[in-house]
Amino acid sequence: MGEETIAAIATGAGEGGIGIVRISGADALQVAERIFRPRRGRPLGCRRSHTVTYGWVVTPGGDRIDEALALVMRGPHSYTGEDVVELQCHGGQLAVRRVLEQALQAGARLAEPGEFTRRAFLNGRLDLSQAEAVVDLIRAKTDRAMAAAVAHLRGSLRQAIGRIRERLMEMMAHLEADIDFPELELEVQTREEVAAGCAWCLGEVERLLGGARTGRILREGLRAVLAGRPNVGKSSLLNRLVRENRAIVTPIPGTTRDVIAEWVELGGVPVQLFDTAGLRPTDDPVERIGVARTHEALAQAHLVLVVVDAAAGLGPEDREWISQLPQGAARVGVANKIDLNPAFELSALREALGGAPVVGVSAETGEGFDALEAEVARVAGAFDASEELLVNARQAEAIRRARNHLRDAQATLESGLGDELVAIDLRAAWMALGEVTGETAGEELLDQIFSRFCIGK
């Protein structure tokens, strides 16, 4: 893969002030020289690294396509670790595409998705956790998600994994030396010292796994579902929270027949709000489909906003559907239309929710919405991102396997079985953790990871 010179558009689709075509590989400078004419001075191949040259992108016949800046970055001090040239032209779709076409005609190959970052990984510029952080940084929706991605890009996860693997390697070396050379009087760790090392590694692994759910929330968003009986004002609540008229609102019960999703940021966490069909028995086949989708949304929710009509009071129908809510999600009670019944007893709703927090609001006047947003932000903030070691699903799966192997090693030590069995478990944990940083990752895993990238990254 690394022997070919590749090129791709590195900026997003659509019109913009600047468009970038990235070229990387052993012949990147030669390819760029064939299509770029400096306004004055030496050709690109004679330019120093990390310099900018003004000129024109031209056809083989010398016709000018667009004026551009050429950035020369010689390997290994570039993103990919190879010679890289970036051509910055005007950001029109046609202009950027024409520049890319010239680069391909001059000898470059169109890059595959994620191929630039894959080359950075293969050339030792990034480990696998840092490569994945590039995607997280691009897709970050909040400051907290961005901070976590930047921490991984700096190598925080690599360093944490490295410390655990180093300790595992030290224990393996002592155990295997004693196994292979029993006749020598080597200074080796006692089984008690190995057990203490396993306990330390297990504690570090558990700490990393503690950030798995938070990492998923920051990447994918907190799923907050507005649920309640028909005509309690769920759609009005959604519109007020997202500050636009996104959902249709009428006084007719059952207006909302499908799930509507909108994004909002609260507490530094991206929150995806779902307006749902009202929960009630119905003979209407379309409404039944909507109610079924409401139950599907509830099953996947991180937070359920339990909406009741304060003007009508908390009735037995409300208590019935509240009692049937799936377990696992956080809950916040919302008594809407509180302006029509200021005497509504919030304590009754709190009791029905088993002590969950409740707020009284009015989607009509905006009363109580600061308190509601604060409660949602509190739930979102409960996913602590302070350590910034927020692993993704793939990384968590590898770390869980390492945890299982460490537990097996502990059990082997406690049972008094041979050191060779302990060493096998420790090596398996060491290998599993290596998948996080890519040190023990195979081609199939790399293909899977880098296929998530866009072309040009």
From Swiss-Prot:
Its EC number is 3.6.-.-. It holds the Pfam family TrmE_N. One of its GO terms (biological process) is tRNA methylation. One of its GO terms (cellular component) is cytosol. Disulfide bonds: none annotated. Homodimer. Heterotetramer of two MnmE and two MnmG subunits. NCBIfam families: mnmE_trmE_thdF (TIGR00450), PRK05291.1-3 (NF003661), small_GTP (TIGR00231). This is tRNA modification GTPase MnmE. It comes from Symbiobacterium thermophilum (strain DSM 24528 / JCM 14929 / IAM 14863 / T). The gene is mnmE.
